[in-house]
């Protein structure tokens, strides 16, 4: 499927194809990738479309090669991306740490599958910690965006490119295998963000420009301390300006569901059904996982009686919820370790049970 999907009307497409086409519309100039299920359609789409548009496409020899090619392209100010999944993203952690230190605007699409290790190709959210905390060395953070619909695969791909270049920071679009393979109607439209001028720092050729050096090495402890202070001031700004979430029926809620990605779809349906039953249930869906909407959750903990985290893992986002709630009210976990998310019926039954306590 290499044809460019139309910008002007609604079309039915997979999450992976939606991401790839949105990246093309966003102006992605370079794609470097290595195939792995369940995200291989992204590379498939790019292999045809990027060459058709005379942009750079490389099917790399490994995941390590592909992410380091992205670093090289981004150091010139280019819009560059790669895509991968779980065990393969693990191989990219060193490069992500360097990208954070070098302040390079890389975009990584991570479509999660079962793990740890090779695992399997079923949907999972087991890489929440890997994305939000980081698997490389040092005190760095990445921007992490989490779509829950195929339309959001489009919208957040656009935002990923914009935020990566606006803040010169590695940015991850974190989806799961279910969303990558799901088909829904979407509208692409035009790229909605202003272009960011990367000319002041990029290695754009030596002719007629000042000398520039991009490096992660700091020769002294004092130099590294100052750099880290600068880096974390940027992270603080990102938290203040870019934290995003969807919130429904929380004003009077006794129980608040917190969920991201594909499980949030079932959580939303369950919340609506419980409202029809007279149960005071609300929902908060983080759209940015990093920065996490901790302040808003802390505010809701002043009025809610309980939170339930709905995830496809053994309980990872729940730790961030507990930190935000800070012991004010209980935080419970409803999960599946891997595979399909908890069903609407399971969520409703859990809400009923927790309402009786």
Placement of each model-derived feature along the sequence:
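Peripheral docking tails and interdomain loops at the edges
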Residues: 311-357
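Redox- and metal-dependent alpha/beta enzyme cores, enriched for Fe-S-associated oxidoreductases
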Residues: 247-284, 290-296
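Glycine-/acidic-rich phosphate or pyrophosphate-binding loops and their flanking alpha/beta elements
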Residues: 14-18, 232-255, 268, 272
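Thiamine diphosphate
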Residues: 1-134, 141, 149, 337, ...
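Conformationally flexible catalytic loops at phosphate/diphosphate-handling active centers
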Residues: 168-247
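Conserved thiamine diphosphate
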Residues: 123-176, 343
